[in-house]
Amino acid sequence: MSQQEPDDSRNCIVAVTLDEESIGRSGPDIEHERAIAIYDLVEKNLFAPQGGGEGPYTLHIGITGNRLMFDIRREDGSPVMVHLLSLTPFRRIVKDYFMICDSYYQAIRTATPDKIEAIDMGRRGIHDEGSRTLQERLAGKVRIDFETARRLFTLISVLHWKG
């Protein structure tokens, strides 16, 4: 008997909310970046909590101490799981990511196309590192594909952004 691939058509996030008490509101630029990150994540993702049954899911994100809280629920609001994810493994990556993003935004004003491309390749490399770290940290708890990990990492980065 061959093992079938799971049907992931319903294993997805259909809504993301941020806990205003723990994350708080920011200036209009940061709020705009958060909205874009959430839109991109909801638009296309694979999200399958272990033992969570079939989706789709909603994701409420908050910060508790030094941990990112993923409150995962079904579309009807019934709880699936709450997963706390340490932010420590992401601090250096997010810091490096913001430094290279700053360099990129400065370069697009004055640098040559080759220099801009080199900086952008570095930015993508750091983003990929953060995405892989996120996939590793969620392994065995929530199954996500690499593109979903990239979108979630973008959202985590924007949550760290102080402007």
Curated annotation (Swiss-Prot):
What Pfam families would the database entry show? UPF0262
The family database entries (InterPro entries) matched by this protein are listed as:
UCP032146 (IPR008321)
The record's similarity note reads:
Belongs to the UPF0262 family.
Q: Output this protein's name.
A: UPF0262 protein RPC_4416
Protein's organism: Rhodopseudomonas palustris (strain BisB18)
Which taxonomic lineage does the organism of this UniProt entry have?
Answer: Bacteria, Pseudomonadati, Pseudomonadota, Alphaproteobacteria, Hyphomicrobiales
